[in-house]
Amino acid sequence: TEEGEFLHEGGGVR
């Protein structure tokens, strides 16, 4: 999801 991608980016996953 878009929110999931945001969380991933914020968490440094990407």
Swiss-Prot record:
Keywords: Adaptive immunity, Blood coagulation, Coiled coil, Disulfide bond, Hemostasis, Immunity, Innate immunity, Secreted
Any one GO biological process: innate immune response
Coiled coil listed as a keyword: yes
Record carries keyword Secreted: yes
Organism superkingdom: Eukaryota
Cellular component terms per the entry's GO annotation: extracellular region
Free-text domain note: A long coiled coil structure formed by 3 polypeptide chains connects the central nodule to the C-terminal domains (distal nodules). The long C-terminal ends of the alpha chains fold back, contributing a fourth strand to the coiled coil structure.
Localization: Secreted
Complex formation: Heterohexamer; disulfide linked. Contains 2 sets of 3 non-identical chains (alpha, beta and gamma). The 2 heterotrimers are in head to head conformation with the N-termini in a small central domain.
Annotated S-S bridges: none
Post-translational modification comment from the UniProt entry: Conversion of fibrinogen to fibrin is triggered by thrombin, which cleaves fibrinopeptides A and B from alpha and beta chains, and thus exposes the N-terminal polymerization sites responsible for the formation of the soft clot. The soft clot is converted into the hard clot by factor XIIIA which catalyzes the epsilon-(gamma-glutamyl)lysine cross-linking between gamma chains (stronger) and between alpha chains (weaker) of different monomers.
Main location: secreted
Function: Cleaved by the protease thrombin to yield monomers which, together with fibrinogen beta (FGB) and fibrinogen gamma (FGG), polymerize to form an insoluble fibrin matrix. Fibrin has a major function in hemostasis as one of the primary components of blood clots. In addition, functions during the early stages of wound repair to stabilize the lesion and guide cell migration during re-epithelialization. Was originally thought to be essential for platelet aggregation, based on in vitro studies using anticoagulated blood.
This protein's name: Fibrinogen alpha chain
